[in-house]
Amino acid sequence: MSFQKVDPAQIESVLSKLTLEEKISLLAGKNFWETQDYPEKGVPPVKTSDGPNGARGATFKGGVTAACFPASSLLAATWDLDAAKHIGEALADETRSKGARVLLAPTVCIHRHPLGGRNFESFSEDPFLAGKLAAQYIKGLQGNGVAATIKHYAANEQETCRFTVNEHITERALREIYLKPFEIAIKESNPLAVMTAYNIVNGTHADSNNFLLRDVLRGEWGWKGLVMSDWGGTNSTADALNAGLDLEMPGPTRWRKVDEVLAVVKSGAVLEETIDERARNVLELLAKLNCFENPTIPEEKAINRPEHQKLIRSVGSQGLVLLKNEGDVLPLRKEILTNKKVALLGFAREALIHGGGSASVNAHYRVTPEEGLRAALGDTVEFEYAKGAHTFRQLPLMSDNVVNLEGQPGWTLDFFADEEPNGEPGSSISSEQPSYIPLFVKESWGSVRASAHFTPTQSGKHYFGMSGLGRSKLLIDGEVIYEQKLNCPDSMGFLLGGVEEPEIQYSFEAGKTYAVEVVSVKPTSKGGLALLDGFIGFRLGFMTEEEHNRDLLSEAVDVAKRSDIAIVFTGHTPDWETEGQDQISFHLPSNGSQDRLVAAVGAANPNTVVVNCTGVAVAMPWLDKVKAVVQAWFPGQEAGNAIADVLTGAVNPSGRLPVSFPRAIEDAPAHGNFPGDYTDGKDNRRHLEVTYKEGVFVGYRHYDLSEANRAKVLFPFGYGLSYTTFTHANHKASATSRNTVEVAVDVTNVGTCAGADVVQVYAGAKLAVPENPVKELVGFAKVHLKPGETKTANITFEVRQLTHFTERSGKWELESGDYEISIGQSVRDITGKVEIGLEAQNYKP
């Protein structure tokens, strides 16, 4: 399936029929997901959808189910270009099933710091690996007829103050690290759309940044397509239009109201020709997607395709990385475990399949690790489960033992125009839960009152947790027991379930009925509310005293002691690792509970295995106390099956780390410069400024600088174990022309089972200079081998990959001399080196 060829005459014909006012209206969304249409003028709409690991459709939470694919950090861990392309192809099917033709993906920003809240959505700390995988993802997506939207252009490496943070990045670091994955993917796969980032880059917001949009994207790279803002990420009228932002999303517009744009056109700040150019790019996207011939937006459907289930399971297992396997405790063979007991601890009954935010998906189903292992090992193995640790960030919503004002299960929500909920409400609804998320709501009320009658089944001093976008209070039998007196300090955290809530206790008597109310008012408008500005919102969590104070750790240790194997499933739920917030700790949540669980179980059972589901590196203070560790990332809806496949040996692990795992957060290259420092602005507000002081020395480029730095790495970039062993021989490299280098190495599987090795090629000057990395990834290949089999891996890379940007000359430059080609199985495990001589080169961007 290919895109329609654009007929310039058709575009100009449609454009000529539109008034200036209508052209302006085309430059902002009609609603949250669709573009503006003018059916009477022959202009159809097009629908967009999140996101990188599943086409969610128009509903942020709930809604029509969709396939949930592995997160991009897992996809990167496969080091498999074909896998990335297949995921893209399948996502195109999913996107169409939601009536959309534009998928808001992939995300290719760099893993600058392990605490980056959105790292899991992106591929790697290495721009070459990220760019290559993104290019194949886009080829798969667009080859199947759906437009890709590469994002977030550029340098969206943190979530803290993401709408306003000013990032100071040298031009060299910007070009070599942060723009490079975009450049590779755009030049190799030509995505139809680019989404700008929220942040400020060197003093100018990305959506109005002439250097990024005009000079580099459309100028140097020659890209022709549609540039859209991130949702709520437009920050100006004239500047963004002139810089090249074609489409403000979502609608209704905040910055492109017709009268306001007409005013800047009349003043000469924006030329009418610029409006035409922006509108033309919108129309060309519609033409490429066949919207003119087929303007209908179909209803959303849930299509649970068996081929997608198989793909998700396969790619999920390929991306799992075996970090430790002492004494070959893995794989867990069925014949060995017959009549044995296996302890399943931690998140064994919860499938951690995705991170939070726009990557959230209402999956068709979720396979838990327990379900996957029971299916794989059968009834001959005895399993025993214990939770082991409290990991909640917020108390679960209060939905048990409550009835609304009509006596039905749930809550009554009354909405009022005024901030005081007096008199008759303007609207009332019934809700299963005491929560109101206003993201897709058109009406902006002054206040909301949630009411229910609660009859506890247990006496005790039970716990509440509450938050609201604006001032809020909790009442029991008319008495205020807690009051939030200010706006929520983190509106995105509220939206995505990551805002910190105080815990309030209240004594209840079993069998007695209590009137529970929450009153929340519209927040005082301020910077930072973004899409939630002017809307009410609240949530109320609850947990009994018995459950809250339960000694889960002792229960888990007892189970581990009486088991032959103990498997601890650790990780991040979507409210701990999410868009909108950077993580609060390098340690697993919450408050050290998971670290204590692993350490205690490791001490109780000598055969302890840890399976960690996070999208990022985490601290592992218990590493020496366990036999095996598997990094499982976020594997998608088949999580439990993919994990079981690797644990039982049905699949030989072949994943390799796309990021470095530091020993401590202080060892991260960006430590001390993340998320930045606050300064007082002229507008009497605090502004976050961050300087990328590490320059080009991101990830392994930093650790490679010295032995002292290398000692700070727990697991290096490119690392991963297998159930078999591979050897390399006959390392060769030669410059076949002035522009290319060919590398070859013989790979042999000397073990007893089939597997896949990832051959990695790094290159750098033999005589390294302090301002340049020692070596950088320039190529890779995944080689599948049967026991005893040998294959030759052939990898070609371009000489210009070795150039560095010189700010003084404004050119990419390569000095003549000897260069070392390092071939290996990780950035640290180099199996052979070959020297080649190269001539000097330089070229303009």
From Swiss-Prot:
Record pathway: Glycan metabolism; cellulose degradation
Residues of the active site: D230
Segments forming domain PA14: 406-557
Record flagged with keyword Repeat: no
SMART domains: Fn3_like
GO molecular function: beta-glucosidase activity
Glycosylation sites: N202, N235, N591, N612, N794
pH note: Optimum pH is 5.5.
Domain of life: Eukaryota
Reaction it catalyzes: Hydrolysis of terminal, non-reducing beta-D-glucosyl residues with release of beta-D-glucose
Pfam families named in the record: Fn3-like, Glyco_hydro_3, Glyco_hydro_3_C
Keywords: Carbohydrate metabolism, Cellulose degradation, Glycoprotein, Glycosidase, Hydrolase, Polysaccharide degradation
Residues in coiled coil: none
GO annotation, biological process: cellulose catabolic process; glucan catabolic process
Temperature sensitivity of activity: Optimum temperature is 52 degrees Celsius.
The enzyme's E.C. designation: 3.2.1.21
Function: Beta-glucosidases are one of a number of cellulolytic enzymes involved in the degradation of cellulosic biomass. Catalyzes the last step releasing glucose from the inhibitory cellobiose.
Entry similarity comment: Belongs to the glycosyl hydrolase 3 family.
Name of the protein: Beta-glucosidase B
Lineage summary: Eukaryota, Fungi, Dikarya, Ascomycota, Pezizomycotina
